[in-house]
Amino acid sequence: MNTEDVLAVFREAGAILEGHFILTSGLRSPVFLQKARVFMHADKTEKLCKALAEKIQAADLGPIDYVVGPAIGGLIPSYETSRHLRVPSVWVERENGVFRLRRFDVPKGARVVIVEDIVTTGLSIRETIDCMKDLGIEVVAAACIVDRSAGKADVGTKLIALAEYEVPAYPADKLPPELAAIPAVKPGSRNI
């Protein structure tokens, strides 16, 4: 599955939105990938996550003990990808603004892959890596359905992206006039 195949799934689901969006990262963009419109369809989710699992396996990372998803956005793709990798899925969630592994006991030395939905700046993955390191868990790679940065985001580890789709993103004080003229909407989930 290549980038065009992935974007075709997003288009079928009506998940490529145009307007003025405040991304989870705080950056502004004329395009928003509303993955919830994809993930509400089990068949589309399975297709994408199976392909992502195959790409992870092809990366020859050695044994993987768990898949870790950052809540909220990474929950569905991490679970579905773990199903295809045939390993357990766990997640981190924010507690006082910091990712914590609250509901699971993952042994020290376990080898994990972090699976995220969309990467823009890589912050959620970096924060998940910090959490794993604090617990003595080895992050062997991160993976995502779409890398909006087209490989430019620093995620702190090897990033395996099913698709790279570079979309412009701007700081709020550096918007092009045509974007600034459109009222901004904030559809992300970081502060939930």
From Swiss-Prot:
<feature type="binding site">
    <location>
        <begin position="116"/>
        <end position="124"/>
    </location>
    <ligand>
        <name>5-phospho-alpha-D-ribose 1-diphosphate</name>
    </ligand>
</feature>
<dbReference type="InterPro" id="IPR029057">
    <property type="entry name" value="PRTase-like"/>
</dbReference>
<dbReference type="GO" id="GO:0044205">
    <property type="term" value="P:'de novo' UMP biosynthetic process"/>
</dbReference>
<comment type="pathway">
    <text>Pyrimidine metabolism; UMP biosynthesis via de novo pathway; UMP from orotate: step 1/2.</text>
</comment>
<dbReference type="InterPro" id="IPR006273">
    <property type="entry name" value="Orotate_PRibTrfase_bac"/>
</dbReference>
<dbReference type="InterPro" id="IPR000836">
    <property type="entry name" value="PRibTrfase_dom"/>
</dbReference>
<feature type="binding site">
    <location>
        <position position="148"/>
    </location>
    <ligand>
        <name>orotate</name>
    </ligand>
</feature>
<dbReference type="Pfam" id="PF00156">
    <property type="entry name" value="Pribosyltran"/>
</dbReference>
<dbReference type="GO" id="GO:0019856">
    <property type="term" value="P:pyrimidine nucleobase biosynthetic process"/>
</dbReference>
<keyword id="KW-0328">Glycosyltransferase</keyword>
<keyword id="KW-0460">Magnesium</keyword>
<comment type="similarity">
    <text>Belongs to the purine/pyrimidine phosphoribosyltransferase family. PyrE subfamily.</text>
</comment>
<comment type="subunit">
    <text>Homodimer.</text>
</comment>
<feature type="binding site">
    <location>
        <position position="120"/>
    </location>
    <ligand>
        <name>orotate</name>
    </ligand>
</feature>
<dbReference type="InterPro" id="IPR023031">
    <property type="entry name" value="OPRT"/>
</dbReference>
<comment type="function">
    <text>Catalyzes the transfer of a ribosyl phosphate group from 5-phosphoribose 1-diphosphate to orotate, leading to the formation of orotidine monophosphate (OMP).</text>
</comment>
<dbReference type="GO" id="GO:0004588">
    <property type="term" value="F:orotate phosphoribosyltransferase activity"/>
</dbReference>
<keyword id="KW-0665">Pyrimidine biosynthesis</keyword>
<keyword id="KW-0808">Transferase</keyword>
<dbReference type="GO" id="GO:0000287">
    <property type="term" value="F:magnesium ion binding"/>
</dbReference>
<protein>
    <recommendedName>
        <fullName>Orotate phosphoribosyltransferase</fullName>
        <ecNumber>2.4.2.10</ecNumber>
    </recommendedName>
</protein>
